[in-house]
Amino acid sequence: MHILKMKKHSIFGSALLSTALLLGACGDNEEVTATVDSSQVQNEFGFQAFELDIDTADQNDAIEASFDIDVSETEAEYVNKLESKDLTGNEAYTELEPIFKDLALTKDMSKEDVIEKVSKAFGAEDYTEFELEVEFSDGDNQEFSDTK
């Protein structure tokens, strides 16, 4: 009887721990809850997904920006250690939107042009490592990387 009680408590404890971990993970929400018109955004930005990672001599992962829009949701995250910014969701989107509009990236741009425009827009022209993955509005995926 004592073993059965312990087993019951062990299962209950595991379920409780699993629930706590699941709820804790939900707190790291990158979802943009503000209304975002996906077709308008794709026309303005020229892309539907953007994943950037820039290292500088002084700071690994100095800048990380991610944006993904689809029919059901939009996600955004922006970390800029050079400016002490760590934003997710609506705050990240508000910060990234004007940068993305100014970039005016197209899939026909050269690697050099893309890297120059993006590193300048994010204030990281002196990067040591640059990695960018973009999914353009037509679904074409391109990767741009450089090391200095």
List PLM regions with ranges.
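Mature extracytoplasmic domains of secretory-pathway proteins
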Residues: D61-E125
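C-terminal motif of bacterial Sec signal peptides marking the signal peptidase cleavage site
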Residues: L22-A25
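Hydrophobic helical h-region of N-terminal Sec-dependent signal peptides
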Residues: L16-S18
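Bacterial signal peptide processing site
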Residues: G27-E30
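Extracytoplasmic
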Residues: F47-A49, N60-A62, Y127-E129
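Short, exposed beta-strand-loop hairpins at the edges of beta-sheets
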Residues: K120-F144
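Post-signal peptide N-terminal segment of mature Sec-exported envelope proteins
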Residues: T35-T56
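Bacterial N-terminal signal peptides that target proteins for export
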Residues: I3-G13
